[in-house]
Amino acid sequence: MEELAKKERRAMDPGGLKKEGKVEEEAGKEEGREEEGGEEEEVTSETLRGKPRPLPISALPAFSYIPPRHQGPKERSYFSREGQTGIVSLYDCVFKRRLDYNQKLHRDDREHAKNLGLHINEEEQERTVPVLMSSVYGKRINQPIEPLNRDYGHVSHVKTDFYRKNEIPSIKGPGFGHINPA
């Protein structure tokens, strides 16, 4: 019982019984007891708080874990580009907001309410496989899928030349030439 009372007093007065005046005597007695009975752990806020326990296996997400900061190469990131923003603290997000008026923004408080400040088209052009389905159309406008083939270009010239020289009236408009439509 006496040891329990001393532990409680020591927890309440971490300075070690300075109020009673018998600091040196009590400290010597306690050290002797600690050596005999084993080491006693000093009670601090860190030991009371303890180490944070890891989550149980059932609480861990299987495939949905997203790391807070992506540090890998840009080819392996979702957006295929380097992160441009640094670490912004919660205090700055809440208390250091821009208070100036932007007339192009919607009345909503969201920062990217109408995608102002975002560069979606540039991100889509940098990706090897586009995320947005609408970006597939015209994705490779600078790089045509099939190279231009001029091998059969002379066919159209031959056809026009043939019909012009032989004056075939079916090519010409109605009522023109010696054959009139019935």
UniProtKB/Swiss-Prot annotation:
Residues 33-44 have a biased composition (Acidic residues). It is found in: Cytoplasm, Cytoskeleton, Cilium axoneme; Cytoplasm, Cytoskeleton, Flagellum axoneme. Keywords: Cell projection, Cilium, Cytoplasm, Cytoskeleton, Flagellum. The keyword Cytoplasm applies. Residues 1-32 have a biased composition (Basic and acidic residues). Residues 1-54 are annotated as: Disordered. It comes from the Eukaryota. GO terms for biological process: flagellated sperm motility. Expressed in sperm (at protein level). One of its GO terms (cellular component) is axonemal B tubule inner sheath. On the 2D-gel the determined pI of this protein is: 7.7, its MW is: 22 kDa. Microtubule inner protein component of sperm flagellar doublet microtubules. Microtubule inner protein (MIP) part of the dynein-decorated doublet microtubules (DMTs) in cilia axoneme, which is required for motile cilia beating. This is Cilia- and flagella-associated protein 90.
